[in-house]
């Protein structure tokens, strides 16, 4: 994966900056793809103390796109098929590079003076998958983790990567999924949620009938409510 990265799209806090949300886009998208959702969250609920960071994935060769470059957090070698096959074909190197990137992004916010419990990491599809992995393996306790239409990466070895005393063992995790998702099957997300629950993580799982690989207003409203709950105004 290329080390060259475009600086994230940033929505500064409208008042004193006391919290940060890092929201991560999916394959082929950019941070701009989620700008309108962020603008709605900011406008409707007046999260004036929250800074929103929308990172941009680097342009990398994507196997399912005939090796052509597109924005991606890691390579996708196959779409569809059984879960075991999908896991065997994970781009472990690319995943770990992005995991490090998000850990560094979180640390930058902490270094700027934001308490880690006032940071939420979340995303959609590939971005949600990275958020789950990076969030749960972060050494600082976060305020919350969100995975929309996503799944747990490195699931076969995840249990060996974590321990009961980890900082984010009790961090609230919310996973949302469309029941008609043709790209990341709902069952894959459900298995991920069940695996995490089995390991003792605080995971809430919700599905949306008729929803494909996308986001619907009801889901975005629930994300908004989660952010308000985890990041209430301090001033």
From Swiss-Prot:
Active-site residues annotated for this sequence: 125, 181, 213
GO CC, alphabetical: cytoplasm; nucleus
Keywords: Cytoplasm, Fatty acid metabolism, Hydrolase, Lipid metabolism, Nucleus, Serine esterase
PANTHER family recorded: LYSOPHOSPHOLIPASE-LIKE PROTEIN 1, LYSOPHOSPHOLIPASE-RELATED
One Pfam short name: Abhydrolase_2
Record lineage: Eukaryota, Fungi, Dikarya, Ascomycota, Pezizomycotina
Any Gene Ontology biological process: fatty acid metabolic process
Record function comment: Hydrolyzes fatty acids from S-acylated cysteine residues in proteins with a strong preference for palmitoylated G-alpha proteins over other acyl substrates. Mediates the deacylation of G-alpha proteins such as GPA1 in vivo, but has weak or no activity toward palmitoylated Ras proteins. Has weak lysophospholipase activity in vitro; however such activity may not exist in vivo.
Annotated organism of origin: Gibberella zeae (strain ATCC MYA-4620 / CBS 123657 / FGSC 9075 / NRRL 31084 / PH-1)
GO molecular function: carboxylic ester hydrolase activity; palmitoyl-(protein) hydrolase activity
Family the UniProt entry places it in: Belongs to the AB hydrolase superfamily. AB hydrolase 2 family.
Keyword Cell cycle: no
Main location (coarse class): cytoplasm
Enzyme Commission no: 3.1.2.-, 3.1.2.22
Compartments where found: Cytoplasm; Nucleus
Highest taxon, organism lineage: Eukaryota
Protein name: Acyl-protein thioesterase 1
Keyword Nucleus attached: yes
Catalytic activity: S-hexadecanoyl-L-cysteinyl-[protein] + H2O = L-cysteinyl-[protein] + hexadecanoate + H(+)
Gene3D superfamilies per record: alpha/beta hydrolase
